[in-house]
Amino acid sequence: MADAWEEIRRLAADFQRAQFAEATQRLSERNCIEIVNKLIAQKQLEVVHTLDGKEYITPAQISKEMRDELHVRGGRVNIVDLQQVINVDLIHIENRIGDIIKSEKHVQLVLGQLIDENYLDRLAEEVNDKLQESGQVTISELCKTYDLPGNFLTQALTQRLGRIISGHIDLDNRGVIFTEAFVARHKARIRGLFSAITRPTAVNSLISKYGFQEQLLYSVLEELVNSGRLRGTVVGGRQDKAVFVPDIYSRTQSTWVDSFFRQNGYLEFDALSRLGIPDAVSYIKKRYKTTQLLFLKAACVGQGLVDQVEASVEEAISSGTWVDIAPLLPTSLSVEDAAILLQQVMRAFSKQASAVVFSDTVVVSEKFINDCTELFRELMHQKAEKEMKNNPVHLITEEDLKQISTLESVSTSKKDKKDERRRKATEGSGSVRGGGGGNAREYKIRKVKKKGRKDDDSDDETQSSHTGKKKPEISFMFQDEIEDFLRKHIQDAPEEFISELAEYLIKPLNKTYLEVVRSVFMSSTTSASGTGRKRTIKDLQEEVSNLYNNIRLFEKGMKFFADDTQAALTKHLLKSVCTDITNLIFNFLASDLMMAVDDPAAITSEIRKKILSKLSEETKVALTKLHNSLNEKSIEDFISCLDSAAEACDIMVKRGDKKRERQILFQHRQALAEQLKVTEDPALILHLTSVLLFQFSTHTMLHAPGRCVPQIIAFLNSKIPEDQHALLVKYQGLVVKQLVSQNKKTGQGDYPLNNELGKEQEDVANTRKELQELSSSIKDLVLKSRKSSVTEE
């Protein structure tokens, strides 16, 4: 009952409150949304929608929840996780991060994560536990463990060294943290190990063998060396090739180097390398700062050795001899080093070229070279005189001598340029602490491969620059002959020096020899001046006139034959008499061009071409046409060219008259008859008889080859009695038979078949007998007629 009344009193109180309460207005959800949007648009309210769109949240609330989440997660949270927890777009999270970092200095953003100082302190405590356990930790391992960048971890842990972390970091390599005990233990091991080393030792091999931490070893080693606790030096820095050189070894090394240099006067770079000195040049320059040294390719030499070489070279130049410096130098020095040393020595002499360098190490004075040239002087005169007698033509002109001089000057110019380049190269490769001037020329034989290499170098420059120019036509001696001659007069000379000296002398010897030949020729032709020359011209004109008239008469005789026979006779005449008269004219002109010919018949077509190349343009045109007409097929063309050539050469040709022609006919017939009397050759008897019978019948001369004899005999058929012609034909048949048997015997060799031997020998004997019997009768056909005609005349 009491409960019921209690309920009644409570309800009465509620009713009373409802009666006195003020009325409140409630807005609908749509109205609320419109009002909030309007406030946001007017920038009177700053709120952010959640991702589901059901709630609004203020930026301050976002920041508060981010701080709360960072605290809940132990001081490290990913911003992606924050976006999922707070349920807003990621851009709003990123916008609030900047405000949080500015307002709270102990919070920082690292790789998309918020990290505060509390987290870093706990991380440092964990690192310290690991460090105390193992003695060292590496930043790289910590980066993998905590998924943080190395620079950030290094900075964070460095700030906590000595406060949270009991250890220190390597100043040279900030990637490792050590404990003091670890460093002290390794320092003791390093000190003990390197104190026991007595020779240069690679640091890298010790690291791999004893398990040292590489960077710690270098730091401790550098500290011990700088403090003087370890006596030695580390060569090569902190590299794989670093070498520790103890002081005891360095002292022994320096003692050996000083002793060797004092005794020998030079230092070889390879020897220093074998001693463990990696940079020999720098070592020598550092150790001998005040000593005058010459640095070569593979060694350096002292001033004493340089002075010794200089004295030997000076003595050779002053005494007019030669010297090879190779025996004066240590055997370990290469030829290249010896050449550099010699070039440096030559700079100490006067700037005028007083010596020539051969084979890189041989210095030859100019006087010695001149003496060698003089050794050939007598031999030159002997050979020149012999040459003038034996050689059918000598074309030693001013142009030849001028060309030799040009080649010599160009060669000298090229040598000077090579010397200049070599001097500059030497100044770059070798150095002397002192002055000097360059003077000597150097002569080298170019080692040319047989195939494949194109001269890419400059020893062939002279030859290539004169490609196409005519070389001297007369040479003195070949190089091997010069070498043999020099070996007889130069004792104990290196073979390579002899070869190079011979090659060097070839051009000046040839030039001198040409001058000697010219001098010999001039002396032999001096007597040909004055009245003698007039007599020579007179004789030439007489001989040319005789041959000219003979050609004219021979031309008349050819016209009795058919065209094909005329062509053969014309060709024979051009190759014989016409060529003789041409050679006479060429020989006459060549005498003015320093040409010597004993027999004009020895002048060939090639020699005529050489003579033409020496003539003046006016004379060359006419003589060239005359030379070319010998290969034509017309006597008239040749006569025309001959007239032009004679006029160009001022040679007067006397044309024959009737009386002169009769004299020539008589003399020609008499000469052939005299030859016919003495000959016993059947073929020649037939040839001479046929030509003489032709002259008797036609009163003209005929110059015919042997192959035209049948045509001459055929022509005589109607010109001589029938019995004489029959005798000629019979004799011709026997001559042909004999020639055929001789040719057949030559073709078969000396061993014909046995069954034919007797028959052939019998035929040959019968033919020979018949020819002998008929020869006198054939001769009488001409000789009897000759006697009667002489009587008539």
Swiss-Prot record:
Region named Involved in CDK5RAP3-binding: 121-250
Protein localization: Endoplasmic reticulum membrane; Cytoplasm, Cytosol; Nucleus; Chromosome
Modified residues (N-acetylalanine): A2
Annotated region described as Mediates interaction with DDRGK1, given as residue ranges: 2-200
Biological process according to GO: DNA damage checkpoint signaling; DNA damage response; DNA repair; erythrocyte differentiation; hematopoietic stem cell differentiation; negative regulation of IRE1-mediated unfolded protein response; negative regulation of NF-kappaB transcription factor activity; negative regulation of protein ubiquitination
Entry keyword set: Acetylation, Chromosome, Cytoplasm, DNA damage, DNA repair, Endoplasmic reticulum, Membrane, Methylation, Nucleus, Phosphoprotein, Transferase, Ubl conjugation, Ubl conjugation pathway
GO terms for cellular component: cytoplasm; cytosol; endoplasmic reticulum; endoplasmic reticulum membrane; nucleus; site of double-strand break
UniProt record similarity statement: Belongs to the UFL1 family.
Function: E3 protein ligase that mediates ufmylation, the covalent attachment of the ubiquitin-like modifier UFM1 to lysine residues on target proteins, and which plays a key role in various processes, such as ribosome recycling, response to DNA damage, interferon response or reticulophagy (also called ER-phagy). Catalyzes ufmylation of many protein, such as CD274/PD-L1, CDK5RAP3, CYB5R3, DDRGK1, EIF6, histone H4, MRE11, P4HB, PDCD1/PD-1, TRIP4, RPN1, RPS20/uS10, RPL10/uL16, RPL26/uL24, SYVN1/HRD1 and TP53/p53.
Protein name: E3 UFM1-protein ligase 1
Species the sequence originates in: Macaca fascicularis
Gene designation: UFL1
